[in-house]
Amino acid sequence: MAQHEITRCQAMILQYMQKVITTYEHNYAIGRRLDMSPSAVRGAIIRLIKLKLITEKDDEGQRLLEITKLGKKHMIILDEIKKSRWT
């Protein structure tokens, strides 16, 4: 399986999605919860969708974000990511 390095923003969103599983929240609400800008949230979500870690569906006119099976298995520890980037 190919390995991809993900950013801190993507890791934070993936950790959040592992806790809530599904959400109808907009980028602004997720950003406020995680202390990120809405544009950073959107960019991270797009990348996570490309990596097939989360999915985005249209549910009666609202965006539904769901974590995939691969996303559930993907364990991310922010401390390890920080260490690997700065060592």
Can you describe what each PLM-predicted range is?
Residues 1-13:
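Short alpha-helical segments that sit at the start of domains
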Residues 15-22, 79:
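Short, locally clustered residues in the helix-turn-helix/winged-helix DNA-binding domain
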Residues 22-33:
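Short acidic, hydrophobic short linear motifs in intrinsically disordered regions
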Residues 39:
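Key DNA-contact positions within bacterial/archaeal DNA-binding proteins
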Residues 45-46:
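Short, hydrophobic-biased segments on the C-terminal half of alpha helices
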Residues 52:
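Glycine-centered, phosphate/nucleic-acid-interacting loop/turn motifs that mediate DNA/RNA or nucleotide
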Residues 58-65:
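Short, Lys/Arg-rich nucleic-acid/phosphate-binding segment
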